[in-house]
Amino acid sequence: MSAKSAISKEIFAPLDERMLGAVQVKRRTKKKIPFLATGGQGEYLTYICLSVTNKKPTQASITKVKQFEGSTSFVRRSQWMLEQLRQVKGIDPNRDSAEFDLLFENAFDQWVASTASEKCTFFQILHHTCQRYLTDRKPEFINCQSKIMGGNSILHSAADSVTSAVQKASQALNERGERLGRAEEKTEDLKNSAQQFAETAHKLAMKHKC
């Protein structure tokens, strides 16, 4: 089981929440925990997770989850409601960068994702979630690449393409229906003409027979 799957199962599932995405990060300015609950020092892995509640009305939140060295379990550390997110900074819109900042009402963190692609995926999910669940004040996405902000546009583009294809197919069917209708009319006319010709021929045959 991957770390993200384990986090989803261990941290969010028991609270009837669904994890939408997560990104493994470390601080740009390295910071160690000087004292753990066990009384010693140690390294740890940090994940920034985005989740929503299964119960309505849906609430979205961002949670900081840690896994300490030597442990197989995960610990929920900090959590913010999505409404508290004020700014998402991508650092450099002109190149793939793993660095990013998150500004909340009462906190500010500077992170480096494990990879630029992982950050990109998380940003796309985060942007889409903000557009879907936040009706009032939405966070600013600053210095983000167009492909990150385009996640939602891609969905709309795909939807537009499908709609266009359906419209074209419908138009083609209508045109085909009209052609079939005209063909049926011609067939009916030919049928009537043939029937009239047969009746006339029969009458002539009977007349000559008499």
From Swiss-Prot:
- Give the keywords, sorted: Acetylation, Coiled coil, Cytoplasm, Membrane
Q: How does it sit in the membrane?
A: Peripheral membrane protein
Query: Which cellular component terms (GO) are annotated to the entry?
Result: cytoplasm; membrane
Compartments (UniProt record): Cytoplasm; Membrane
Q: Which residues carry this modification: N-acetylserine?
A: 2
Q: Which GO terms describe its biological process?
A: regulation of SNARE complex assembly
Q: Which residues form the v-SNARE coiled-coil homology domain?
A: 151-210
Q: Sorted alphabetically, which CDD domains does this protein's record hold? A: PH-STXBP6 (cd14681), R-SNARE_STXBP6 (cd15892)
Task: Briefly state the protein's biological role.
Answer: Forms non-fusogenic complexes with SNAP25 and STX1A and may thereby modulate the formation of functional SNARE complexes and exocytosis.
Record-linked PANTHER family: EXOCYST COMPLEX COMPONENT 1 ISOFORM X1, SEC3/SYNTAXIN-RELATED
Q: How does it assemble?
A: Part of a ternary complex containing SNAP25 and STX1A that can be dissociated by NAPA and NSF. Interacts with STX4A.
Q: What is this protein's record name?
A: Syntaxin-binding protein 6
Which organism was this protein described from? Bos taurus
